[in-house]
Amino acid sequence: MGETVMKMLAINPISLKKRMTEFLFDYLFILAYLVLLFLGSMLIYIIFFNGVPEFTEIQSQWLVFLTSILPITLLFTFLDYKNDGSFGKVKAGLELVYQKKTVQASLIRNTIKFLPWQIGHIGTIHGFYSEFDVLSISLSISATLLAVLLLAMTMFRNDKRHLGDLLAHTQVQLKGD
């Protein structure tokens, strides 16, 4: 099956309102997942462990990665690849276009997109175990700066592409453009 090569727009007409709509719906979806994850985890902890068990820092890092970051990254990778966009993109009338549509491109894009979240978790979890030493604070600041950079790129670049889009050769466009 031959893949269609899509054109990247040098001047992308997506409005800030459409991007904020996309971000809001994706945020609400992720928040709902995290609330269900919390409730399910607490239920399991209460039923099987008589309360929340003690975890080492490494166990906490893996638990957070495997239950929140990895599933969300893989789900958004799937949605971007299969449906040309996340729930937020669909709701906002946007779609993800690829220079060459591959699962790898979608995974690269979403890994970069959720990297600030993962770095933030690493810093915060390390902070709980280290009384917020220089490393944990540095990681938390780095996560925030990277998130701001990615958001600023989607808002202020003429092509509206963030670092993940540049590396994956993708672009969010108005649906049907």
Q: What do the PLM-derived regions correspond to, one by one?
A:
Residues 1-177:
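Membrane-interfacial and juxtamembrane segments of integral membrane proteins
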